[in-house]
Each structure stands twice: as C-alpha cells, then as structure tokens.
C-alpha cells in the first residue's frame, strides 16, 4: 500500500508538469537577460533574476536557482573526494568544519556580482566528480560589508531562546579580511508513554515520560585572502563551543494502573566541548600551462558525554546507572593538485593527498544499588590511520554538447588500534570514476556515471558506548570493522522550463562489498568461552542498493496570471531507497538497517514582490526506519513535519520572518525475541510514543 501511495504521488507530480500549457513551455526558449547562457552547459544568473525573492544572502539566491540542489559530498574517504558543488570566487573553501550553507549565509546578496551554473562533466577542476556546479562571484569593493541575523525560538513550556549570527568582510587592494560570529540555542519539550508488553501483547507496565532537551553552540571564525606576487593565498580558522542536555522524568504504572516507580534521566553530550580548525591553500603556476594548488588542514577538539538513569521502585533499593565518555579526535590533511591544459580539448588533473586521523576514546560505566557501587572495566581505545592517495583525472571536451570526465584514485592506508582493542590492518583500493554529460539542448541535460567509492570509517564505531534510553543497550566497539566499498551505476536527466521551473530524475544501482550494518559482537574469555554478546557496527558481506529521486520545481504563473496574480511556486522532492542484504542472524534476505524506503517533501511559497511579503509552507514525511539487532527488530516512525512562515522584506532593519514548526514526533516499536531473532519466539514488545511541542520562531536578517 505504501509503495502504491509513493508511485501515485510521483505520477501525480509528473502529470502536473506535463499539463503545463505548451505555449508557456515554449516561452523558455526566449532570450532571458537575467539568466543568460554564456556557453553550452552553462548559465549565468545576475542579481535581477532574484529580485522577486528579495534575497538577503547568497544562500537565499542559491536556493532559487532552478534545478540546483547543494551537495556537500557523500561521506567518502579523503578531502578531495568530499568536494561539494559550490564554489566561492572560483575556489573551494579549505575547511571541513564549516558547512557551505553557513558560508553562503554570510555573503550579502548585494555583494554578489553573478552566479554561474555549469551542468557538464568536470564542471570545474575544484569540484571533480560533480556534474553540476555553481560559482558565486562577488563584487570587488573597498567598503565593509556583511550580514546579520537574530532569532528568537520560543516554546509553550520552556520560554525563549535567542541566537545571533553576524559576518563582516573588508577588502584592501588584493587582500580581504573576513570575520564571523555565530550562536545557536534550541529547546525541545517532549512527552508521551512507553508500553512494555508480553510477546502476546499483554500490557505489563506503562511508563509516562516528559522532559526537556536543548543544544547551545557558539563559534568564532575568520579568513584572509590575498596575493603574494602571482600566487593566491587563503587562510581560515574557526573555534567552536558546543553544549547540550536532556532531562527526562517518568512515572511507572503496572498493568492495573498502579503507580510502581519513578525514573530520572540526565544526559548530555557534547558537554561544553571546544573544537578548532585551521586551514589554508596556496595556488600558483610554476610551469607553463600548469596550475598548482596546495591545501593544508588541521582540526581537533573534545567530544564528551555523560548519562545517568535513576530508578526507584516501590519496596526495592534505588538503582543508578551512569556512563561517561571523553573522546579526542584529530585530523591533518595535505593535498597537492596540478591542473594541466597543455593538450587541446583536455583538462588533466593529477596530484596526491596524505591524511592522518586519530581518535583517543575513553569510556566508563558504573552501576549502584542502594548506594553500593559496582564499576565496570573502562573501555579505552586509540585509533590511528594514515592514508596516501595519488590521483589523476582527465576532462575531455568532445564538442559543445558532450563532455567526459575519467579518473582514478589509488589509496594506500594503514589502520591501528591499541588499548583495550588491538588490531592492525593495511588497505589498498583503486577508485575509478567515469562521467559523461550530453547537453541535448539549452534546457535539457543527460548525465551518466560509473564509479567505485570507499566509505569513510566512523572511528567512534571502534569504541564502546551505552544507550540508557533503551534499557542500557550496549553498542560494542568493533576492532574488525573495515570500510564499505560501493560500485555505482547511475543516470540523471534534467529539464528546465518556464524560465524558473525544472524537473529532474536520478536513478542508480549499487553493488556493495563489506556492507556496514549491525552485527553480533561476541566477547570471549582467555579459554575461548563466550562471556557476552552485544550489538555493534560491523560488516555483513555483499548487498545491493537501488535509489531514485524525483525533483520538480513548478512556477504557477501560467495558471494564476490570467486571473490576476502571480508569484506562486511549488516544489516536490521524492526519494526511494531499496536494498537487499543477507541477515547475519537469520540467514534471510532483508533491507539494510537505518535506511527508510522513501522520503517525500512538498514546499509552496507565494511571493508578493510589490508588498515585500512572502507566504510559505513545507511538509515532509518518510517511511518507518528499521534496525536489526541480535535479539530485536526496532521500528521507528516519525510523523509529518510541517512548517508555516511569513516574511516581510521592506522593514527598515532587514527582513522579518515569523515561522511555526510542528515538530515531528515519533513512534518506536521494539520487538524483542527469546534468544536471537533466528528463534522466531517473540518475548517482549515495547511501544514508545513521543510528542513534541511546536516551535515558534521570529527572525530578523539583514545586510550592510
């Protein structure tokens, strides 16, 4: 039924585009002064194109480019492979801590000269592997310019939480100085029951929870961009503070409704943690027809967390379970890339990247009953990885309509674990890639690609942790974890219409080796006897994945202008994610854990440019998420998240936005089996429901 509903939604959306009057579609071929094609596969957007939307920042402008979505990489290994599809003044920022959304929000819309969109293979050497890239080109001015944004988030049960973001840029000749400060504060109030039942669904106990959680963050960053002779030099840095908390209380009732116990949960993480990053690059030409860029990056910090859960049952001693963790991650990267244009019709890039990653993870657990404390052995693990990656690629222009990018990366890496887990492994991978794009006409692009990818390891999976919210469930560190390898074949077709409209369909098929999923982790004594079994992230062999994405942006002026108004735009994004893997516990085929089958989002906005008003709404929903543990199947279903907003852009101090968000609560169902899932004997059912208070948000944003 759900699959039918998904197909119906996709079909309905596609039909909406097909029913657009043919005359309106034909108008797209007319010349457009605000968004002109500068070469095949490329389009330039001047500020006039965005006037209707009254943008404050470059991010506001990028969001309105037809058929374009920001990509920040896909969790692959290496700095180069995680290149996004956004450039600023032709450069990729030499940072991993600052996301591109934040960086674009610091650029005033008034300082954007134009935005160029390229939609061909090898669209830019700075973003190899991306078939669609935008470049935000800023004006050169000696004036100080910047952006500011102040927000108050309010809830009915926790008051007001303010946040502030500001940035400023100063240019002096060939040098620019950038400074940015930001803060963020959020509170969420949640409540709802959790029912514990027998395998035959007889109620044993009901727990009613209510609690408040929050996250606070502050950051200070800056950058200097200059020229030394003919060389371009960029330096950047950031320091960030993070803190969060979760306080939850519960009353326990038996199946007859009698109050039997009280619970208090305290949890935090990060806990006033400080992290920092410094990076930079230098770009120069040492030999004719060759451009060289050297990138260096270093980041480190602390990641701490704590949790405690105290339960007082009638007539029984008070129990207290506590955990503490303190992790120190470190990363250092250096990359040199050379772009050679000495062969007509080709753009060759070659170079190498070297990286060092380190995680010092410390974890402890203690349990007390009636004040008597039992301390468990601490889990201390040091994970270190060194990686060397030479690479080469060639972008071949076959004509005005065809471009091909082909390349390969070789990886040589060594991973060591010491402390409570001891292991050492070496990896060698070849990661080839081929992309071809055909610009069928100025409105239509076809992209085909085949590539081999290696996923980035999450070093935290080598360390042990405990989730006190689901019965003190242990996530055991796995010293045998190796990177997931994926071979992907994909295709994409994109069509633009009505000047601001677009439809895009993407599909891919993936063959996966060493699939990452939940696996049973066995603990043995010195004699080889099993002492315990836990769940943890591990590799479960080969799997297959297939994905589809439909994105439609539909301006409705062709429909509404005949009846006297214009400015309504609708957008739909639908994702489908299929998968098949052999379960390590049952031996049967199933989907991969933590991979919802589908996700859909609908957006609609009405821009009243003359009045400076915008009305809008957004709705998103996804299929339940499943996870497969040793003795449990866990199903979590989040509700529909809805947002309504109104903006006024003619306020003297900037743009005012009032927003109401109906937070998506969730239902979590745990099906716990006697022994393992392979037994098929259902022992316990746990149903949890959480409802969240809506959020009210008032934002003032402006530029100077």
Roles of regions detected by a PLM:
Residues 58-61, 102-103, 128-150, 162-164:
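N-terminal periplasmic accessory domains that precede
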Residues 92-119, 166, 222:
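Short acidic/polar hinge/loop motifs at secondary-structure boundaries
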Residues 109-145, 560, 703:
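A beta-strand signature from Gram-negative outer-membrane beta-barrel systems
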Residues 221-242, 269-423, 439, 547-573:
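Face-selective signature of the C-terminal outer-membrane beta-barrel domain
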Residues 273-275, 327, 381-385, 425, ...:
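Outer-membrane beta-barrel signature, preferentially recognizing the C-terminal barrel domain
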Residues 302, 360, 414, 424, ...:
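Surface-exposed extracellular loop regions of Gram-negative outer-membrane beta-barrel proteins
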Residues 508-511, 530-625:
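Gram-negative outer-membrane beta-barrel transporters
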Residues 648-704:
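C-terminal beta-signal and adjacent terminal beta-strands/loops
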């Amino acid at each position: 039924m759900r699959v039918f509903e998904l197909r119906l939604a996709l079909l309905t959306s596609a039909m909406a585009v097909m029913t657009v009057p043919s005359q309106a579609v034909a108008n797209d071929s007319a010349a457009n002064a605000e968004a002109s094609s500068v070469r095949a596969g490329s389009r330039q957007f001047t500020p006039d194109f965005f006037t209707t939307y009254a943008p404050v920042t470059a991010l506001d402008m990028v969001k309105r480019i037809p058929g374009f979505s920001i990509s920040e990489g896909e969790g692959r290994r290496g700095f180069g492979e995680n290149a996004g599809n956004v450039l600023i003044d032709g450069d990729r920022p030499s940072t991993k801590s600052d996301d591109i959304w934040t960086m674009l929000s610091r650029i005033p819309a008034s300082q954007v000269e134009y935005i160029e969109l390229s939609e061909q293979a090898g669209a830019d050497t700075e973003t190899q592997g991306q078939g669609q890239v935008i470049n935000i080109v800023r004006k050169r001015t000696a004036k100080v310019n910047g952006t500011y944004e102040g927000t108050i988030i309010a809830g009915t049960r926790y008051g007001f939480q303010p946040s502030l973001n500001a940035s400023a840029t100063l240019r002096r000749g060939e040098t620019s100085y950038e400074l940015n400060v930001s803060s963020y504060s959020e509170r969420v109030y949640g409540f709802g029951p959790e029912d514990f039942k027998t395998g035959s669904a007889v109620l044993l106990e009901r727990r009613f929870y209510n609690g408040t959680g929050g996250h606070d963050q502050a950051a200070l960053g800056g950058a200097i961009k200059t020229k030394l002779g003919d060389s371009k030099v960029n330096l950047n840095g950031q320091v960030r503070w993070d803190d969060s908390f979760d306080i939850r209380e519960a009353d326990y009732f038996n199946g007859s409704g009698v109050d039997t116990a009280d619970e208090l949960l305290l949890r935090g993480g990060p806990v006033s943690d400080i992290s920092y990053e410094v990076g930079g690059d230098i770009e120069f030409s040492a030999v004719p027809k060759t451009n060289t860029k050297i990138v260096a990056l270093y980041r480190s910090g602390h990641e701490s967390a704590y949790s405690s859960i105290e339960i007082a049952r009638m007539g029984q001693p008070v129990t207290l379970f506590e955990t503490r963790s303190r992790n120190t991650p470190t990363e250092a990267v250096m990359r040199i890339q050379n772009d050679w244009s000495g062969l007509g019709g080709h753009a060759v890039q070659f170079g190498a990247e070297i990286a060092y990653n380190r995680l010092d993870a410390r974890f402890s657990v203690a349990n007390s009953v009636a004040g008597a404390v039992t301390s468990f052995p601490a889990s201390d693990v040091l994970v270190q990885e060194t990686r060397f990656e030479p690479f080469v690629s060639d972008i071949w222009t076959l004509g005005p309509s065809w471009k091909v990018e082909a390349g390969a990366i070789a990886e040589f890496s060594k991973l060591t674990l010491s402390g409570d887990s001891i292991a050492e492994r070496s990896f060698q991978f070849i990661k080839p890639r081929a992309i071809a794009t055909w610009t069928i006409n100025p409105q239509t692009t076809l992209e085909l690609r085949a590539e081999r990818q290696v996923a980035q390891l999450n070093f935290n999976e080598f360390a042990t942790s405990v989730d006190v919210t689901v019965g003190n469930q242990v996530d055991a560190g796995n010293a045998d974890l190796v990177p997931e390898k994926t071979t992907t074949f994909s295709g994409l077709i994109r069509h633009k219409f009505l000047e601001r409209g677009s439809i895009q369909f993407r599909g891919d098929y993936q063959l996966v080796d060493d699939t990452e999923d939940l696996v049973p982790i066995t603990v043995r004594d010195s004699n080889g006897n099993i002492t315990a079994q836990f769940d943890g992230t591990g590799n479960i062999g080969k799997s297959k994945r297939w994905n589809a994405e439909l994105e439609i942006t539909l301006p409705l002026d062709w429909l509404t202008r005949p009846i006297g108004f214009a400015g309504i735009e609708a957008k739909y994004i639908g994702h489908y994610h299929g998968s098949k893997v052999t379960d390590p516990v049952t031996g049967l085929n199933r989907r991969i854990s933590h991979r919802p089958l589908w996700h859909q989002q609908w957006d609609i906005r009405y821009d009243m440019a003359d009045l400076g008003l915008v009305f809008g709404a957004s709705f998103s929903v996804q299929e339940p998420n499943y996870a497969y543990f040793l003795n449990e199947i866990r199903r979590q279903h989040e509700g529909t998240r809805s947002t309504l907003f109104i903006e006024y852009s003619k306020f003297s101090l900037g743009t005012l936005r009032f927003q109401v968000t109906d937070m998506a609560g969730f239902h979590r169902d745990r099906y716990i089996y006697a022994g393992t899932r392979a037994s098929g004997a259902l022992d316990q059912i746990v149903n949890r429901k959480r409802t969240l208070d809506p959020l009210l948000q008032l934002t003032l944003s402006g530029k100077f």
